[in-house]
């Protein structure tokens, strides 16, 4: 389910007041503006969600304008907002077919209030200046944490803003939701690329490359690497080896498997998640640095795996890193993924105008 309906007992309207069955007089809420922002790594369908939010808001009598934060929460802090109301319905509809983050994204995590009260006060200033009553934050786990913090702080500050988290992550690692918008399209890209690359390697394996290593995203969750298994068929044995973050890397067993596969099939296709790690928890590709979210910066696991194979087995290899290609491949997006990306955006607006707060839309 993507939405819900709340029953009420309002039966008539008089002089800008709602009269319910218990004769309570409730002033009608004035329509407010909304802010939508994108955060973290983008996808080929995140703009489909943006399209849904804007289209649903335009149909609601409780929302006037929808502003978009340029470069995510950073744009809101800098009061660098995009007024989407000046765009035609036709222009907004084009978002459904555009990969990347059309409004810009960021990797900026709000600290706890006691560590960065200045930022929270700045958000209140911007919200007040633009009559914001709704905040939609489209992102992964860190983004949902930000949405929760803003909802709590605005409430405590006496300027409550309805905050709704909209899921987006190609890693498919958010809790509660069955799957995450963005994942399906990347899974399709990886499975297709794995099958195509396998056919290439197989055709040259007699006299050239024996091993192909394909690196995909997925720091702590192996959903993307595992999706390469969809390439397997009766006539295609690749991928022969999939290295997941959840399964500790054992070099001895790995090398034996590579030799066994080549002996049997003549070539070996390996798909490895960027988060593949040793038993002690150290990433194979640990670069020794961290990103702006405090996560370890990974330096590329495919060349590391290739190095191990070359050093221990002396086999000719090629490796590839799908990197941004996998998450921006709109030309091969999954229709189910597109449908879900639109549905969660539409549901976010429905939840917000019905009075829900601190909610994460889930599938």
Predicted features and spans:
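Accessory alpha-helical/coil subdomains and C-terminal extensions
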Residues: 66, 126, 137-139, 147-160, ...
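Conserved small/polar residues in nucleotide/adenosyl-binding loops
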Residues: 361-363
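N-terminal phosphate-binding or glycine-rich loops at protein starts, especially the Walker A/P-loop
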Residues: 29-80
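Short, ordered loop/turn segments at secondary-structure junctions
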Residues: 39-41, 69-74, 107-108, 140-141, ...
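Short glycine/serine/threonine-rich phosphate/pyrophosphate-binding segments
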Residues: 43-53, 76-77, 120-121, 141-149, ...
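Short, positively charged and aromatic/hydrophobic N-terminal segments
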Residues: 2-25
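Glycine-rich oxoanion-binding loops at beta->alpha junctions
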Residues: 79-133, 142-143, 188, 195
